[in-house]
A protein has these predicted regions:
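Walker B catalytic acidic pair
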Residues: 132-133
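Phosphate-coordinating catalytic segments in nucleotide- and nucleic-acid-processing enzymes
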Residues: 1-124, 213, 219-220
């Protein structure tokens, strides 16, 4: 039984995401995946599950609010069919009219942002969510909102979030206690650990911004 639990946690409880520029354009449903597939190819199924769950009203409201924060004209995201979805439409409110656009017609940045939201809000939630360079293709205003969503996810009990980034703008949204440094030591072994104590203090005293750990004063790992 313990082996089964461990296997399930490793295979279904972890999501690893590095969304490509054409994310959310594929119509492959990938029904065998548990939760959002790593390439988000089954996004139609995930959208359907969120949309049909009576318990997910707060989830739908959270996603809608985040989308409206980056584009106030967005009224909704709807599927063409609940039973057998083939397309998703983004409704844009223009005056007293709503203009529906297919999801694949939206910008790369919008689709990437939305894909991250689907990963963060999927049901059931993953135990661990890993995102590789989530800043790619996201404009600065949306990046701030995405950072807020990353931080809110574990607080809401929707899983641990691990990010890898080379973006000073994204790193600026996280405190010293959130940051881990990855280094390759002299034995060519990967070491991961908290930020060096002197750099932590510099951040807390606002002598250094977190983003400057990638530019001005490269991040160092605390000695063991």
């Amino acid at each position: 039984e313990e082996v089964v639990v461990a296997y399930t946690a490793l295979t279904e409880g972890i999501g690893v995401y590095a969304f490509p520029y054409d994310v959310l354009t594929s119509k492959h449903k990938a029904d065998g995946a548990s939760g959002l597939a790593d390439d988000a190819a089954n996004f139609l199924v995930v959208l359907r599950n969120i949309g049909t769950s009576l318990q997910d009203m707060a989830t739908r409201k959270g996603i809608a609010a985040a989308l409206r924060s980056i584009n106030p004209t967005i009224a909704s995201v709807e599927l063409d069919s609940i039973q057998n979805p083939q397309r998703a439409y983004v409704g844009h409110r223009l005056g007293d009219k709503t203009l529906p656009l297919e999801l694949h017609q939206e910008s790369d940045g919008f689709r990437r942002f939305y894909a991250h939201l689907l990963a963060l809000y999927q049901t059931p939630p993953k135990q661990t969510l890993v995102f590789e360079e989530p800043e790619n293709g996201i404009y600065p205003g949306a990046l701030s909102l995405l950072a807020d969503e990353f931080k809110a996810t574990p607080e809401a009990g929707r899983g641990q979030v691990i990010l890898t980034t080379h973006s000073p703008a994204l790193l600026d949204h996280f405190s010293a206690d959130h940051i881990r440094v990855v280094e390759l030591d002299e034995a060519l072994e990967t070491r991961i650990g908290p930020l060096a104590e002197e750099q932590k203090e510099a951040l807390k005293e606002e002598l250094l911004h977190a983003g400057e750990l990638l530019t001005v004063d490269p991040a160092r790992r605390q000695d063991e």
